[in-house]
């Protein structure tokens, strides 16, 4: 604030509860179910209380060709094991980190962020379950998609409660910054191409 800089804060779809089946808007009520969502929401509130200019970007199901993430885990498991169970009753939208970074770069480099500070949602376009995502990873990587088996969340008991529906409405960010957001399957294909896994069918 003292330097007149704009803060960029990456937040999460997990600030919302899991009820409903309508994409979440930026002004929808928040109700985080777990510690992760609560800490991210606390960060959003701290920024608001500080009174600094900020862009708060809520994203979801983030992955890339770098580090450890769901895509690389599914590539490894599907290549090495005969059956991989993945939940089909949690819906959201994957986000390719390169697309998120590209959107942020455009927002900053164009100068359009000035006067448009606030909270925005960004993920790739479309909706899928974790099972749909894992199945498509196998298909595009040249692995056997029949190894990916759908299951209920109850088959994976966990102390961490996750929202059953956390699709983000991206109308605001698209209209404010004139963004065209790629569909999640197209983004996944680009990531796999960069990993060199689309036709190789090898473990990562």
Task: Label each PLM-derived region with a short phrase.
Residues 8-11, 55-56, 93, 121:
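Structural signature of the Rossmann-like NAD(P)-dependent dehydrogenase/reductase core
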Residues 45-92, 98-99, 105-106:
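NAD(P)-dependent short-chain dehydrogenase/reductase
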Residues 154-176, 181:
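A hydrophobic C-terminal alpha-helical subdomain
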Residues 103, 110-159, 199-204:
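Mid/C-terminal beta-alpha module of Rossmann-like enzyme folds, strongest
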Residues 74, 104-108, 134-137, 188-195:
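Hydrophobic "lid"/C-terminal helical patch
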Residues 184-204:
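Amphipathic terminal alpha-helices
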Residues 27, 34, 92-95, 128, ...:
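Residue-level signal for the nucleotide or nucleotide-sugar donor/cofactor binding architecture
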Residues 2, 6, 15-57, 61-62:
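Catalytic helix-loop patch of NAD(P)-dependent Rossmann-fold dehydrogenases
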């Amino acid at each position: 604030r003292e330097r007149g800089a704009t803060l960029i804060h990456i937040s999460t779809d997990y600030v919302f509860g899991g009820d409903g089946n309508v994409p979440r808007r930026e002004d929808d009520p928040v109700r985080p179910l777990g510690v992760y969502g609560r800490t991210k929401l606390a960060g959003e509130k701290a920024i608001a209380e500080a009174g600094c200019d900020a862009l708060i970007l809520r994203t979801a199901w983030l992955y890339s060709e770098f580090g450890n993430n769901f895509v690389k885990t599914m590539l490894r498991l599907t290549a090495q094991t005969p059956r991989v169970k993945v939940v089909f009753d949690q819906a959201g939208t994957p986000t390719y980190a390169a697309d998120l970074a590209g959107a942020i770069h455009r927002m900053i480099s164009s100068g359009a962020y000035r006067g448009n500070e606030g909270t925005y949602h960004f993920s790739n376009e479309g909706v899928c379950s974790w099972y749909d995502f894992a199945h498509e990873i196998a298909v595009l990587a040249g692995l056997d998609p029949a190894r990916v088996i759908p299951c209920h969340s109850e088959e994976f008991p966990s102390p961490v409660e996750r929202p059953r529906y956390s699709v983000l409405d991206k109308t605001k960010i698209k209209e404010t910054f004139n963004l065209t957001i790629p569909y999640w399957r197209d983004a996944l294909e680009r990531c796999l191409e960069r990993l060199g896994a689309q036709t190789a069918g090898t473990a990562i």
